[in-house]
Curated annotation (Swiss-Prot):
Expression across tissues: Liver.
CDD domains: CYP2A
Highest taxon, organism lineage: Eukaryota
EC number: 1.14.14.1
Organism, scientific name: Mesocricetus auratus (Golden hamster)
InterPro entries for the chain: Cyt_P450, Cyt_P450_CS, Cyt_P450_E_grp-I, Cyt_P450_E_grp-I_CYP2A-like, Cyt_P450_sf, Cytochrome_P450_fam2
Protein name: Cytochrome P450 2A9
Record GO terms (molecular function): arachidonate epoxygenase activity; heme binding; iron ion binding; oxidoreductase activity, acting on paired donors, with incorporation or reduction of molecular oxygen, reduced flavin or flavoprotein as one donor, and incorporation of one atom of oxygen
Membrane topology according to the record: Peripheral membrane protein
Enzyme class: oxidoreductase
GO BP terms, alphabetized: coumarin metabolic process; epoxygenase P450 pathway; xenobiotic metabolic process
Record lineage: Eukaryota, Metazoa, Chordata, Craniata, Vertebrata
Family: Belongs to the cytochrome P450 family.
Keyword Heme included in the entry's annotation: yes
Amino acid sequence: MLGSGLILVAILAYLSVMVLVFVWKQKFRGKLPPGPTPLPYIGNYLQLNTKDIYSSITELSERYGPVFTIYLGPRPVVVLYGYDAVKEALVDQAEEFSGRGEQATYNTLFKDYGVAFSSGERAKQLRRFSIATLRDFGVGKRGVEERIQEEAAYLIKMLRSTRGAPIDPNDYLSQTVSNVISSVVFGDAFDYEDKEFLELLHMMNEMNKFAASPVGQLYDMFHSVMKYLPGPQQQIIKNTKELEDFMIRKVKQNQSTLDLNSARNFIDSFLIHMHEEKKNPTSEFNIKNLVMTSLNLFFAGSETVSSTIRYGFLLLMKYPEVEAKVHEEIDRVIGRNRQPQFEDRMKMPYTEAVINEIQRFANLAPLGIPRKTIKNTTFRGFFLPKDTDVYPILGSLLTDPKFFTSPKHFNPQNFLDDRGQLKKIAAFVPFSVGKRFCLGDGLARMELFLFLTTILQNFRLKFPKKLEDIDASPKPLGFSRIIPRYTMSFLPI
């Protein structure tokens, strides 16, 4: 009895301290935007639908406007909803909002290192180098285009071997797309049966799913406690160590055969730059940043494109009249006697519009990647202290009725003008906007066009059930949306 009483007293004392700390912090938060009243320590957790955070935020924006504050646990997050608010922050005040916000799942691995999850001078140095080096290795140019064409040709060969039988396209696409970025980062591609490669893809996929899940959200809010408790987060923590160890091995392989006068891949280029910068005390070029930047590129270059293509298949089967028009444009512009080239897109406005609409409608990461203020900032009359987390809701731009007709419906005409030509839309920002837009956007655009057109040049898509049975709605999963698994057939043309 005495022991139980002491435990109860300890718990009550702990909660009391948390409440006092919470109240004390509110006095020093600056003049943050309004929002729902938070509870001590747990914040607004009980007011959010943890299975569909995006919908909860949309509802809150209708009540509090385009700029408001929610508390994820004890941590305040300023939410930017709609084109105007996001543009003002990420473009007009780009420097102030250029920091990377907190995401506990990914911070467990990256710990503020690497190009994607760092801030300040580190992020600037690594970003400049990464963009220049990716360009040197042909990203957005003919060099990487040829690698994509090679992988696309191998993918066609594998799909033909299925002989029209129903298959799950997920694994085929995931391995194919990942091998493109592998050739840039490592200098070569993996064998599709390589167990280490398959396990690597599995761990990255599990990490992304966990980060978006309700348990992942709890971990994001209360990671200081949950990292010591049993649960699925322990497997994720274990996986992060294995991912880091994998990349360390890759870096050591390159170090052992490095030629300072000839870079074979991204890792070599980074190692050479490390050598050149070794006497610079402010240099961010070190092994830790190399390992984490290489992992950043591998993450970014693997899952998003393959998921978008899988969702594209589902939509094209749901709307066969759209697939038919894409086939017609491919036949007219490219024909059947050569592989598609990226420059073909200039003569294929309808296909480009379809690809854009697939990305818009999928809206796979509606909350974007969190930002934070790198200095005390005034925004729309509110005072945001340095290191305030900010969520620019990119999904709110992709579904804005001011820019897209019937945004809840799939309609490639959103991206075509009255003459049937492709038009630019300011709110179409699937790769974010401003100083921290996705540095792999050029590669992703090239992959989406070449993989999709190459597949549709060779196959028609068939769903094994009736068209009305196709559920083409992305499934909300916490902070993101996922594509349901399904089977389909690729029928040779």
